UniProtKB/Swiss-Prot annotation:
GO cellular component, one term: cytoplasm
A biological process term (GO) from this entry: L-arginine biosynthetic process
Gene field: argB
GO molecular function: acetylglutamate kinase activity; ATP binding
Organism: Dehalococcoides mccartyi (strain ATCC BAA-2100 / JCM 16839 / KCTC 5957 / BAV1)
Enzyme Commission code(s) on record: 2.7.2.8
Subcellular location: Cytoplasm
Annotated disulfide bonds: none
Protein name in the entry: Acetylglutamate kinase
Domain of life (superkingdom): Bacteria
Protein's job: Catalyzes the ATP-dependent phosphorylation of N-acetyl-L-glutamate.
Enzyme class: transferase
Residues annotated for substrate binding in this entry: G46, A47, R68, N166
Length: 272
């Protein structure tokens, strides 16, 4: 993998919801990255598991612009599933492969501090600040951090409000990559690549081009927070990519060979 000037070997990886599938190879790839001397930092979501447990508990799932409206009861489920079940399943899988890993949430050591986005979406929040102290301590101890995006509700918290927030894992990944000045930010998702205005798959794009895709509305749905996070990371000197995590060993292929999905660089590329 080609390193940037800082060469700190940190790779921030946003894991898609398929990582617990027995056929998924992402966690095996992470073991290989460790052997190559890289320092993976994992951020995960788990929306489908949250929705499944919400249904079991008789709670309605409501979405606004693709993000979960998080009322008081839903926040309980989000915290229990993301910071608990999903996080520990990933940690256990890594431990089973011989990788030292520790599961944390954004609440631990105030790693991710946030604020409520809007009253109508409840405890759905946005990142205000990232504290890298705990993440760095784990990396220094050769322990792979596995981070749930459940975060600390501190900024502008109304009196009587809860101290937890549900924050989308995509922007959390971008903010953490930026704060760590990571070498790479990688999104493992369920599409082959970012698409251009004519539906064509885009291989390498500049930060400016990514911004144009967002401004024009060409990027839509779940691709919006991913591209925004890629832009955040490139401003800190990282390169970022979005690849299809459904294909075997795409993570290791991207980080050793490249050109597996869409790479966003901070450079200004000449485009036709």
């Amino acid at each position: 993998m080609e390193m940037t000037q800082s060469s700190n070997h940190i790779v921030v990886i946003k894991l898609g919801g398929s990582v617990l599938d027995s056929k998924d190879t992402s966690l095996k790839d992470i073991a290989t990255l460790k052997q190559l001397g890289l320092k993976p930092v994992l951020i995960h979501g788990g929306a489908s598991t949250v929705s499944a447990w919400s249904a079991k508990l008789g709670l309605e799932t409501r979405l606004v612009n693709g993000e979960r409206v998080t009322d008081d009861a839903t926040l309980d489920v989000v915290a229990a599933i993301l910071a608990g079940l999903v996080n520990k399943e990933i940690v256990a899988a890594l431990l089973d492969m011989g990788i030292k890993a520790a599961g944390i949430s954004g609440v631990d050591s105030a790693t991710i501090t946030g604020q409520i986005r809007a009253t109508e979406t409840g405890y759905l929040g946005d990142v205000v600040q990232v504290n890298t102290e705990l993440i760095t301590a784990l990396l220094d101890a050769n322990i792979t951090p596995v981070i749930s995006p459940v975060s600390f509700h501190q900024t502008n918290r109304p009196s009587g409000s809860r101290r937890l927030l549900n924050i989308n894992g995509d922007p959390v990944a971008g903010e953490i990559a930026s704060a760590l000045q990571a070498e790479r930010l990688v999104f493992l998702t369920d599409v082959p690549a970012v698409k251009g205005k004519n539906g064509e798959a885009l291989g390498e794009i500049s930060a400016d081009h990514a911004a144009e895709l967002l401004a024009s509305g060409t990027a839509s749905g779940g691709m919006i927070p991913k591209l925004r996070s890629c832009l955040k990371a490139t401003l800190a000197g990282s390169s970022a990519c979005i690849i299809d995590g459904r294909k075997p060993h795409m993570l290791i292929r991207e980080l050793t060979e490249g050109n597996c999905g869409t790479t966003v660089t901070g450079q200004h590329l000449r485009r036709s």
